[in-house]
Amino acid sequence: LQAAKGKKCAGTLAANVGSEFNMSFKVTVIGAGSIGFTKTLISDLLKVPEFVTCEFALTDINPHNLDMVKQVIETIVSVNRLPAKVTATTDRRAAITGARYIMSCVRVGGLEAFSTDIAIPLKYGVDQCVGDTICAGGILYGQRNIPVILDFCKDIREVAEPGALFLNYANPMAMNTWAADMYGGVNVVGLCHGV
């Protein structure tokens, strides 16, 4: 999809969207303030005909980043003349309300906490280049994320569309997905967009 270059995307889906597609479901992205990840994720979804008419509800704790990402996604939708709707709120529960698909791509603690996931193991002789998913750094990251993931699950159970699917992209992906599956009481799948 053509983003913000002001050109119509060759092969845009807009011309192929007929009355058979209705804006009948909502996709919520929690942690949508990451411009690179959210833009790529939603751009990919907009290549699927069933998603070009849905509502994308973006939520993040950082209102500045959230607004930037919303503008980028709205530009993608507009340039490609798609009927998708884009909303943004810092109220996570409002964003989840009525959603069929809820995606988590949060980094609890931000980059500051991430640096401690590397520094603490290194202090004890464990040199790991990334602390996202494995080793001591991954465990530290999981301890920060799992309580938040379970809060998301509570909201999903209470206000999302019945039978909604929670798609976890947040690292440590396996730990977060396991916690949501074992203790969250929601339908959940763990995914890695970068593989």
Model-derived regions, located:
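N-terminal Rossmann-like dinucleotide-binding module
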Residues: 27-52, 56
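NAD(P)-binding Rossmann-fold cofactor-contacting core
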Residues: 50-74
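Rossmann-like NAD(P)-binding element
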Residues: 59-65, 79-163
